[in-house]
Amino acid sequence: MYFYSLVDDVSVNTKDYLKYIKSKHCLVCGSTPVDADHQDTIGMGGDRKKQSIKDFTCIPLCRKHHTERHSIGSFQFEHKHSLNLWKEAFYLLRGYFAE
């Protein structure tokens, strides 16, 4: 992805951003607590403790909706809940840097 090529050489601390995401409410039902759900997935066996630029693609979803998204897939999830997950991820990232 083009975004990653822009920031490959930049050392970023994503822990604060993940805390920011986890302070939000679920995009679907508004509940808390939430998981930081990666749009650009880490994958099975990926090192979730290692900081990654992929952390900036996270959205807040409660455990129920996080599990649902992975069960039915992003396309069906977006259609069912009338969401654009990448757009939401962008708005959250923009809001984080605006604070």
Region locations from a protein language model:
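A boundary/linker detector
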Residues: 1-18, 22-35, 87-99
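Short, non-ligating residues that shape and space the ligands of small metal-coordination modules
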Residues: 32-36, 68-71
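Divalent metal-coordination and catalytic microenvironments
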Residues: 21, 38, 62
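Short recognition patches in nucleic-acid-associated and regulatory proteins
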Residues: 33-49
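Polybasic, low-complexity binding patches
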Residues: 46-57, 67-99
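A broad, low-specificity signal marking well-ordered, structured residues that form hydrophobic/aromatic
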Residues: 34, 59-60
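Cys/His-coordinated zinc-binding microdomains
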Residues: 30, 63-66
